Amino acid sequence: LTIGFARRAATYKRAHLIFYDMEKLLEIGKGNIQIIFSGKAHPKDMSGKGIIRNIVQSAKKFDGKIKIIYLENYDMWLGRLITSGVDLWLNTPQRPNEASGTSGMKAALNGIPNFSILDGWWAEGCRDEQNGWAIGNHEALGDEKDALDLYSKLQSQIILGVRQKYL
């Protein structure tokens, strides 16, 4: 299962959420998933640049047990490749900060199911277990609860579905 996460590197987008509990991610992801990250930070956004560094450092800690890559030089061409070439689109913004979530829209237009916080367009577009999966509910739950729901659904619904040829 190839998971994609590509967009502007901004703190509210919480690219790091999937790494909240690295042991749990390894437990459910080893041999089951690979993750492709990409994005850019504004040149003056030190926090955004830090997010990219943290993703790269976190990926190294898995030592190949889960394949994780950060593709540099994100642009429209690379975004098109990623949003059409993954099996699942991950979107984990802090509610209620996502204005629209165009990367998830692009993935959906390419037939890629979304796995997302109910914010931006996904708050209205989500048909849980039909066109993707919701992480959490319509309330801002915080990193811990969102991460626990992410891991639970990834393991019990999404990966299991792939094994059963659901996706």
Protein language model annotation of sequence segments:
Residues 1, 54-105:
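Donor nucleotide-activated moiety binding/catalytic core segment of transferases
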Residues 1-74, 165:
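Conserved catalytic-core segment of nucleotide-activated headgroup transferases in glycan assembly
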Residues 3-5, 35-37, 55, 68-71, ...:
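Generic structural hydrophobic/aromatic packing signal, biased to beta-strands
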Residues 15-17, 46-49, 79-81, 101-104, ...:
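A short acidic (Asp/Glu
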Residues 26, 83-167:
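Catalytic binding pocket for nucleotide-activated donors in carbohydrate/polymer assembly enzymes
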Residues 47, 51-54, 78, 146, ...:
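Alpha-helical structural motif
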